[in-house]
């Protein structure tokens, strides 16, 4: 336990409000966009992955994953 | 009833001529009924005639004390019924049918009674018209607030789109209308119809002459305007010399030898305007009792040529205004047809997402207002054809409170309001809100 570093998503001036819904959504889209960009290599996309996981409720992520699998997610970038 | 009040009025005029002062309305009524019906009226009957039916010249104030009528109840009770029906408190198809017919019938009766108050009872004085126009303005302001709230919701949703629609506006993957197709045609139609209706109104209120580069027509117009001024300023004694000058311009000097033949022809034309004259000039002096003087002379001694000039002018003018009204109506109908087409073939529906909901809410309420505006324009078209806006009724300046074109003016305001809302809709929804 001592060696483990707990870290949440850093401050992003695009989302200055208390409501971080869109911040979570943007990280989800960025993460999968990044993975797509590096042809499935997610090693360079860990910042987005961490932010996404600390901001988004797990239920949302699983719902969006289902949408993505069914090609229903509302974005071009994933 | 109208004949009775005219007699009452003439009795007053006679009294002014004979004794130099007006008799009271009740005394005059008593006198006339004694003379014409052969028996005296009871006090309460005289009171009824003079208080319940109050012609303008019998009142000591300029306001309209409206009569009791069932129309407001016939319109508002069904509204309450509709609400109860909507929430399922009452559900009866027959009741709904009765309520709907009562609602429409009440509106029709109410409209007609207001028009009759103006035309036959002469209740619409300067102050009353000012109140009517003020009421219309208040109504339009409330309508602006109504649409403002929907625009607010549109901007609230579209300026910061939700994650569910991909954080973009219009929503991700949705096909929306281009601003260059039917919407642009609709914009042109509405703006053109507004301009044309305004043009008709300016002609109606004599701010603008009926243009045609024809000397005869111009001579007629000028003659007519001069005639109107002469009659309105009550200096109608020397109109005949003035008409002689006009006659030379209009028919040429050589026609002087054929004056008799020309006059015989013109008698035929003047027959057409006779009815109009009987109605209008009586109404004019009926409406303006302050113009009555001891040497009051009934304006029935116009020359035949004057009638002819007026007839020609009025016919041309009526034709021009009618064309404009029909054109406006046509534009409104084509607009509604285009909107119907757009709705029918829309790639989104009212209940499949926020875009469809807002689109149909805003354009649907606007379309409903266009429909109401078309009905109003239809009403003033019918009123124009029937002759509610005849020249002497209308007046010769842009003075909405001083003439009989208040209904036309209010319709015009409403139509321009609908135009302006459409411009905002076009800019915000079709142009800014498209891809």
Swiss-Prot record, chain A:
It is a peripheral membrane protein. Disulfide bonds join 24-56, 34-45. GO terms for biological process: oxidative phosphorylation. Pathway: Energy metabolism; oxidative phosphorylation. One of its GO terms (cellular component) is respiratory chain complex IV. PROSITE patterns: CHCH. It holds the Pfam family COX6B. A motif (Cx9C motif) lies at residues 24-34. A motif (Cx10C motif) lies at residues 45-56. It is found in: Mitochondrion inner membrane. Belongs to the cytochrome c oxidase subunit 6B family. Component of the cytochrome c oxidase, the last enzyme in the mitochondrial electron transport chain which drives oxidative phosphorylation. The respiratory chain contains 3 multisubunit complexes succinate dehydrogenase (complex II, CII), ubiquinol-cytochrome c oxidoreductase (cytochrome b-c1 complex, complex III, CIII) and cytochrome c oxidase (complex IV, CIV), that cooperate to transfer electrons derived from NADH and succinate to molecular oxygen, creating an electrochemical gradient over the inner membrane that drives transmembrane transport and the ATP synthase. This is Probable cytochrome c oxidase subunit 6B. It comes from Dictyostelium discoideum.
Swiss-Prot record, chain B:
CDD domains: Cyt_c_Oxidase_III. It is a multi-pass membrane protein. Its EC number is 7.1.1.9. GO terms for molecular function: cytochrome-c oxidase activity. The chain crosses the membrane at residues 70-90, 96-116, 132-152, 176-196, 325-345, 360-380, 412-432. One of its GO terms (cellular component) is mitochondrion. GO terms for biological process: mitochondrial electron transport, cytochrome c to oxygen. Keywords: Membrane, Mitochondrion, Mitochondrion inner membrane, Translocase, Transmembrane, Transmembrane helix. InterPro entries: Cyt_c/ubiquinol_Oxase_su3, Cyt_c_oxase_su3_dom, Cyt_c_oxidase-like_su3, Cyt_c_oxidase_su3-like_sf, Cyt_c_oxidase_su3_a-hlx. Component of the cytochrome c oxidase (complex IV, CIV), a multisubunit enzyme composed of a catalytic core of 3 subunits and several supernumerary subunits. The complex exists as a monomer or a dimer and forms supercomplexes (SCs) in the inner mitochondrial membrane with ubiquinol-cytochrome c oxidoreductase (cytochrome b-c1 complex, complex III, CIII). Belongs to the cytochrome c oxidase subunit 3 family. Component of the cytochrome c oxidase, the last enzyme in the mitochondrial electron transport chain which drives oxidative phosphorylation. The respiratory chain contains 3 multisubunit complexes succinate dehydrogenase (complex II, CII), ubiquinol-cytochrome c oxidoreductase (cytochrome b-c1 complex, complex III, CIII) and cytochrome c oxidase (complex IV, CIV), that cooperate to transfer electrons derived from NADH and succinate to molecular oxygen, creating an electrochemical gradient over the inner membrane that drives transmembrane transport and the ATP synthase. This is Cytochrome c oxidase subunit 3. It comes from Dictyostelium discoideum (Social amoeba). The gene is cox3.
């Amino acid at each position: 336990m001592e060696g483990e570093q707990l870290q949440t998503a850093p401050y992003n001036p695009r989302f200055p409000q208390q409501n971080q819904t869109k911040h979570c959504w943007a990280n989800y889209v960025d993460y999968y966009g990044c993975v797509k960009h590096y042809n499935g290599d997610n090693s360079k996309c860990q910042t987005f992955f961490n932010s996404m996981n600390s901001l988004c409720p797990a239920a949302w992520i699983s719902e969006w994953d289902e949408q993505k699998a069914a090609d229903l997610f509302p974005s071009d970038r994933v | 009833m109208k004949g009775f009040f005219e007699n009452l009025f003439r009795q007053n005029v006679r009294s002014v001529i004979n004794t130099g002062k007006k008799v009271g309305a009740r005394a005059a009524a008593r006198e006339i009924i004694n003379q014409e019906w052969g028996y005296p009226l009871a006090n309460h009957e005289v009171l009824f005639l003079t208080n319940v039916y109050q012609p303008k010249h019998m009142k000591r104030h300029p306001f309209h004390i409206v009569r009791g009528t069932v129309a407001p109840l016939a319109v508002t009770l069904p509204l309450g019924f509709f609400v109860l029906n909507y929430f399922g408190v009452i559900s009866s198809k027959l009741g709904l049918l009765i309520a709907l017919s009562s609602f429409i019938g009440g509106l029709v009766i109410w409209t007609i009674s207001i028009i009759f108050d103006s035309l036959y009872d002469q209740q619409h004085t300067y102050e009353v018209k000012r109140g009517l126009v003020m009421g219309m303005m208040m109504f339009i302001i409330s309508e602006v607030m109504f649409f403002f709230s929907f625009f607010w919701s549109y901007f609230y949703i579209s300026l910061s789109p939700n994650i569910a629609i991909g954080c973009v506006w219009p929503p991700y993957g949705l096909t929306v209308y281009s601003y260059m197709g039917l919407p642009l045609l609709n914009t042109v139609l509405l703006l053109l119809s507004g301009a044309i209706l305004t043009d008709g109104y300016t002609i109606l209120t004599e701010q603008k002459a009926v243009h045609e580069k024809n000397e005869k027509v111009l001579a007629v117009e000028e003659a007519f305007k001069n005639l109107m001024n002469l009659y309105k300023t009550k200096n109608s004694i020397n109109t005949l010399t003035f008409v002689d000058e006009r006659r030379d311009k209009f028919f040429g000097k050589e026609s002087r030898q054929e004056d008799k033949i020309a006059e015989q022809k013109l008698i035929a034309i003047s027959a057409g305007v006779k009815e109009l004259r009987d109605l209008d000039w009586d109404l004019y002096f009926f409406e303006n009792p302050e113009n009555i003087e001891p040497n009051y002379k009934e304006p029935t001694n116009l020359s035949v040529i004057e009638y002819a000039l007026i007839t020609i002018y009025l016919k041309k003018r009526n034709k021009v205004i009618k064309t404009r009204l029909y054109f406006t109506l046509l534009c409104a109908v084509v607009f509604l047809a285009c909107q119907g087409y757009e709705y029918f073939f829309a790639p989104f529906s009212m209940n499949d997402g926020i875009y469809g909901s807002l689109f149909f809410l805003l354009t649907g309420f606007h379309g409903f207002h266009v429909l109401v505006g078309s009905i109003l324009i239809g009403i003033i078209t019918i009123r124009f054809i029937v002759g509610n806006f005849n020249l002497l009724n209308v007046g010769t300046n842009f003075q909405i409170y001083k003439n009989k074109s208040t209904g036309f003016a209010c319709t015009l305001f409403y139509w321009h309001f609908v135009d302006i809302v459409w411009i905002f809709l076009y800019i915000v929804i079709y142009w800014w809100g498209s891809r």
